[in-house]
């Protein structure tokens, strides 16, 4: 991939400085002390067969130190892993960008393998996901490479755009994606400054997410996200939504549809039970996101441990209840009927009952949109009735229109 400046060589690490012996206290040379004291010390050493201080220091330096790490050896090992896993991969080299074209500004998040940094690439705002130094292993680099190769082939308005990757320094193994101003949906829903309704802008974010997932499932073979949740849905300044974070995403295969991955609160029951799953696992996770959109709260926020007044249920207990007791997040009392119906179908224990994302998009654009408009009109009528029934006119309160309309 292109860059904004010429490609530069990797920066070498700065070697550790080797310091000489520390002078004696007060800056005096050891031989500049009192002569009688020196003779006394020499006599004491001869009596105890104790070697001079310098000889003891030499012996100490010759002893192996089990706590010492050979920095060059560590560096060479890292370099070998990176070159084996990344440099030799021609597909990844096509996505490489110059790290010098990136300007890192501030850390805005963290994950299991690295940190999320806001920055710019050639002056354009971007998100940089950089791998932590102590996470540079063959397995993690393989996952890193898999995610890059997957994102390189994804092109859709509701999928976060991949820009490039860089590993020209072993401390700067990272990949770059577009920056969305409002952050993730999890934060958006819990920000008290955001006055959200289904009419504006929840329905749009829901449809956008469904379209992005429908695109992933339309691939040949289908791509199963396996970690769909509100934290992996990013929101733009205009309330558009895009699916992100494909670290656990895989093309559908028999071998890989048996492994348990993802975040517990959004996991479908078949994955918890260790059963084979399909792309309908993502549909279940989307159903949990619907509950978040309805309540603006974390899933299962109201579930308490049995026999305890305010104690929360442990994660393992919660997962057991989801898998074997059909536990699902609760919805609000004001939840629209169409949303409640869609939620129940998405979170059904029977995978065949769950709709496809193409069907979800159609349902949202028709049934949910109609009910949203009806509810919005009802709310407007209530507001108008309250205003018409007011005993005090705006003029009496000193409020006057600045514009007069004439025929």
What residue ranges belong to the model's regions?
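Protein kinase glycine-rich loop
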Residues: 105-116
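Regulatory alphaC helix of protein kinase catalytic domains
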Residues: 144-149
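Short beta-strand micro-motifs within the conserved protein kinase catalytic domain, predominantly
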Residues: 161-173
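Conserved short submotifs of the Hanks-type protein kinase catalytic core
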Residues: 170-184
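Activation segment of protein kinase catalytic domains, centered on the conserved DFG
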Residues: 192-208
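Conserved catalytic-loop aspartate of Hanks-type protein kinases
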Residues: 282
């Amino acid at each position: 991939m292109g860059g904004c400046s010429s490609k530069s060589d990797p920066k070498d690490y700065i070697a550790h400085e080797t310091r000489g012996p520390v002078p004696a206290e007060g800056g005096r040379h050891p031989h500049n002390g009192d002569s009688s004291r020196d003779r006394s010390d020499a006599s004491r050493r001869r009596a105890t067969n104790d070697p001079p201080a310098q000889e003891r220091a030499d012996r100490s330096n010759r002893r192996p130190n089990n706590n010492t790490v050979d920095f060059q050896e560590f560096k060479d090992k890292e370099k070998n892993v990176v070159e084996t896993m990344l440099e030799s991969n021609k597909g990844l080299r096509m996505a490489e960008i110059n790290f010098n074209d990136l300007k890192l500004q501030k850390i805005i998040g963290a994950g299991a393998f690295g940190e999320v940094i806001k920055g710019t690439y050639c002056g354009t705002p971007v998100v940089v996901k950089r791998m932590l130094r102590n996470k540079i292993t063959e397995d993690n680099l393989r996952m890193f490479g898999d995610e890059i190769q997957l994102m390189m082939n994804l092109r859709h308005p509701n999928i976060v755009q991949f820009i490039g990757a860089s590993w020209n320094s072993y401390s700067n193994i990272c990949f770059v994606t577009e920056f969305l101003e409002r952050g993730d949906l999890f934060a958006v829903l819990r920000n008290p400054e955001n006055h959200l309704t289904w009419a504006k802008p929840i329905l749009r974010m829901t449809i956008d997410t469904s379209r992005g997932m429908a695109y992933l499932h339309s691939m040949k073979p289908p791509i199963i996200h396996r970690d769909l949740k509100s934290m992996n849905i990013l929101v733009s300044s205009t309330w558009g939504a895009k699916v992100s974070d494909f670290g656990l995403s895989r093309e559908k295969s028999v071998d890989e549809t048996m492994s348990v991955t993802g975040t517990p609160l959004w996991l479908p029951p078949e994955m918890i039970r260790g059963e084979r799953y399909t792309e309908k696992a993502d549909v279940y996770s989307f159903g949990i996101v619907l509950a978040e959109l309805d309540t603006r709260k974390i899933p299962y926020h109201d579930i308490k441990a049995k026999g305890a007044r305010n104690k929360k249920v442990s994660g393992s207990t919660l997962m057991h209840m989801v898998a074997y007791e059909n536990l699902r997040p609760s919805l609000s009392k004001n939840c629209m009927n169409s949303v409640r119906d869609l939620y129940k179908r998405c979170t059904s224990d029977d995978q065949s009952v769950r709709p496809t994302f193409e069907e979800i998009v159609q349902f949202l654009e028709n049934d949910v949109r109609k009910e949203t408009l009806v509810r919005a009109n009802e709310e407007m009528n209530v507001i108008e009735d309250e205003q018409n029934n007011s005993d005090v006119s705006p003029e009496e309160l000193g409020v006057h229109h600045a514009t007069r309309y004439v025929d």
